Amino acid sequence: MTSIAAAARPMFSFRNLNIVTTVIASLLFLILLGAPDIAWWLFGIEGGESADFVARRTAMLFAGIAALCWFTRNTPAGAAQSGIAKGLALAMVGLVMLGLTEWLRGFAGIGILLAVVTELALAVGYGRMACYPSGR
């Protein structure tokens, strides 16, 4: 195997990447549903009834992401795995762009960078998984 091929190979298997994503999405579900003030504090933004309303709805999306990742963690390489990886990579890239934009415009505090770094790592992981679906 050439060094270029070895460098392009994903560090995590699809299964392990999905398990990590399940844990992160489950934690976000619990925080946003039960204690959204933690997110407001971390991101340095103002909470309130409207923000809490959106947080509860967002929590359910994270529950769905957690379930999707958990129940598809053993999906073999192929079209389904590639589609899941591409969809999650797209979502993570979008979150990275939004997080950086909100931080640069001064709306979100420095804590948003924790989310951005995590989302970027997931975007790279799923992006590489989409390019090299067998996880060789």
Task: For the regions a language model picked out, list residue spans one by one.
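Core segments of alpha-helical transmembrane spans in multipass integral membrane proteins
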Residues: 23-32, 51-74, 86-94
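Membrane-helix boundary elements
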Residues: 14-20, 25-52
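Non-cytosolic membrane-interface motifs at loop->transmembrane helix junctions
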Residues: 45-52, 82-83, 107-118
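Hydrophobic alpha-helical membrane segments
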Residues: 84-99, 118-121
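Juxtamembrane helix-break-helix junctions at the cytosolic face
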Residues: 69-82, 103-104
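Short, Lys/Arg-rich, polar N-terminal cytosolic tail immediately upstream
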Residues: 1-14
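Membrane-water interface at the C-terminal end of transmembrane alpha helices
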Residues: 121-136
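Membrane-helix boundary connector in multi-pass membrane proteins
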Residues: 96-114, 129-132
